[in-house]
Amino acid sequence: MQGFFWKTLLVVALCGTSSSLAHRPLSYGEALELALSVYNSKAGEESLFRLLEAVPQPEWDPLSEGSQQLNFTIKETVCQVEEERPLEECGFQEDGVVLECTGYYFFGETPPVVVLTCVPVGGVEEEEEDEEEQKAEVEKDEEKEDEEKDRPKRVKRFKKFFKKLKNNVKKRVKKFFRKPRVIGVTIPF
């Protein structure tokens, strides 16, 4: 009975120490590859994304037990997620979405954790384009209204109300989809 107790205690001690051992060193390049792999597998996108640019991190410490940060930009490729092709074979889409991402690695956690935040690039330019499109639509609508002057005022008011409603819905939908995507996963070391 006493031998069983010591064997059990030894197994429990080994399991406890193996989970608290230091993580495998992770170079900056490996961290970028892992972050991109996590994004492509967890973001729920139809297309794969590939690294466009990485901001060098001279303070990156592969042996750190604390948190590490990396910044990079990714772009949508022509490959679909279901294809499971290597990213090197995938070219960038001509008008593909460009995302600016920040990754945080927390090596002090057991198991280590990575959290990614990605936001679309060019939000201000898109808003200006949206405003120009809306102005063009308003001008077209005013021309149509001039042609349809014979309609009753009630119809004109309803038409104007529904146009405003439609534009507000469009704005909110675009704003909703511009929100950053945040992904958090544990790293299997």
From Swiss-Prot:
Residues 125-152 are annotated as: Disordered. Residues 23-155 form a propeptide. Expressed by the venom gland. Potent antimicrobial peptide against Gram-negative and Gram-positive bacteria. Adopts an amphipathic alpha helical conformation, that may allow to partition into the target membrane. Low hemolytic activities have been observed on mammalian cells. InterPro entries: Cathelicidin-like, Cystatin_sf. PANTHER family: CATHELICIDIN, NEUTROPHILIC GRANULE PROTEIN. The lineage of its organism: Eukaryota, Metazoa, Chordata, Craniata, Vertebrata. One of its GO terms (cellular component) is extracellular space. This is Lutzicidin. Pfam families: Cathelicidins.
